[in-house]
UniProtKB/Swiss-Prot annotation:
UniProtKB keywords: Chromophore, Membrane, Photoreceptor protein, Receptor, Retinal protein, Sensory transduction, Transmembrane, Transmembrane helix
Protein's cellular compartments: Membrane
Protein name from the UniProt record: Sensory rhodopsin III
Subunit structure: Interacts with HtrM.
Naturally occurring in which organism (per UniProt): Haloarcula marismortui (strain ATCC 43049 / DSM 3752 / JCM 8966 / VKM B-1809)
Top-level taxon in the UniProt lineage: Archaea
Taxonomic path: Archaea, Methanobacteriati, Methanobacteriota, Stenosarchaea group, Halobacteria
């Protein structure tokens, strides 16, 4: 349990530090009124708050009021659609497509919670439905978004591809980890699953922020050309 407290605490620290750095970046070099700038620190702050609560639960300070798993999925159902919406905005897709992508994301997480909270055949039905929603989301990322962003500048396309590829790779590992975990085949035990999920969360979210900060030229191009006039 002490190890889990360290993992959750380290994750929370990484999320909050990345949020603060990005807010500073937005205040000094960007436009905090643009969704391009205010969404990234929101999504890592949500994750940071969830990880603080997880650390407190693991340490016994919050008792059994809520489970770590419930907190984790509550974080994901808020923070992951922000990433999806962000990628959709960056790609410049229309409003209907953005809503479809966000809806698929919410279904993926919401039904995925059924996998960890139900039992028997219902658990595997939930896993299958969540996986189908994820595959649909991947199609939007890889095909629909990619077709639309072909009209953007080379720097914006490169930025989108980096963020999308990071998201696709990390998110694809979550169902594998859960399938191999205690609720699936049992190859991965609960403490190891919690560690792996914490690592994936950190890579997915802090990595997303890091790419944005490093790729400042691409960010600047995007803000100048698209963020002031959102796609309709």
């Amino acid at each position: 349990m002490a190890q889990e407290i360290v993992w959750y605490g380290a994750g929370a620290g990484a999320f909050f530090v990345s949020a603060v750095v990005f807010v500073w970046f937005a205040a000094t070099r960007g436009n905090i009124r643009s969704s391009f700038y205010y969404l990234p620190p929101i999504h890592t702050s949500v994750a940071g708050a969830a990880y603080v609560a997880m650390a407190l639960i693991a340490g016994g300070q919050l008792g059994d009021t809520v489970s770590i798993t419930t907190l984790r999925f509550a974080d994901w159902i808020v923070s992951t659609p922000i990433i999806t919406y962000y990628l959709a905005r960056l790609a410049g897709v229309d409003t209907q497509t953005r809503r479809l992508a966000v809806a698929a994301n919410v279904v993926m997480i919401g039904v995925g919670y059924g996998f960890v909270s139900m039992s028997g055949s219902l658990r595997w039905i939930a896993f299958a439905v969540s996986t189908v929603a994820f595959i649909g989301l991947l199609y939007l990322y890889i095909k629909t978004f990619a077709r639309k962003i072909n009209a953007a500048t080379a720097s914006v396309r490169s930025l989108f591809q980096s963020l999308r590829d990071l998201t696709v790779v990390t998110w694809s590992l979550y169902p594998v980890v859960y399938f191999l975990g205690p609720l699936g085949t049992g190859i991965i035990q609960a403490p190891d699953l919690n560690f792996l999920v914490a690592v994936l969360d950190t890579i997915a979210k802090v990595g997303f922020m890091s790419i944005l900060l490093v790729r400042y030229n691409s960010v600047e191009t995007f803000v100048d050309s698209w963020s002031v006039a959102p796609a309709k």
